[in-house]
Amino acid sequence: DVKERSAVVRFKVKGEDAYILAWTTTPWTLPSNVALCVNPDEDYVKVTSKGYTYYMAAALVDTVLGEGAEVLEHYQGKDLEFKEYEPLFPYAEKRIGNKKAYYVVCDTYVTLTDGTGVVHIAPAFGEDDSKVGHRYDLPFVQLVNEKGEMTEETPWAGTFCKKADMAVLQALEDKDLLFDAPLFEHSYPHCWRCDTPLIYYARETWFIRMTAVKEDLIRNNNTINWIPESIGKGRFGDW
């Protein structure tokens, strides 16, 4: 388990003086954001607090906003589906293409255990995000290269993405879009050899239909003089 800065971010709603309040434990993925996700079956509210108007989960208002918040309207998550918002950053513009982006989607994987009941979606950097992205045909935006560094479209080109967290948070703060950046303790994968943080990273992959070549593999395996013999009959011969 590690303690890291999470981000509670204000996403400006299109055509309204209001924000969708969303949470993420990976601030470095925010430049690649293309959607926000709510749970279709949970209760959400439009609420005012300290001069701002927010959309968020009803159950988390007191935890996130504290006392004094005034609820204006009630919704089910599914009522917010397709509500549009303005992008946080312009860096993904060329990668969006003609696909629709920057709107609210729904999925039951969103929980109310932590955060705001709204999570940001970057399909290139998570299994749940990827599934939601495919279902809604969201654009694939990956502003991190295969070395794990932020790409040239961003101001942090060449920086290892995890080390870009604080710079991304500062950029949001400068835009008055960062509501909070609390420390959050969670399990995070690290390399077992060098203890470097790992990232979820979508990439093209080859898959081989082994049933089509199984008999050839067994026949060729039987021509090999394996020492010890059990390796050939076991690990390489057991199909």
Regions found by a protein language model. Give the residues of each.
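Residue patterns forming the tRNA-binding/recognition surfaces of aminoacyl-tRNA synthetases
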Residues: 1-31, 84, 109, 113-239
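Catalytic alpha/beta core of large soluble enzyme barrels
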Residues: 32-146
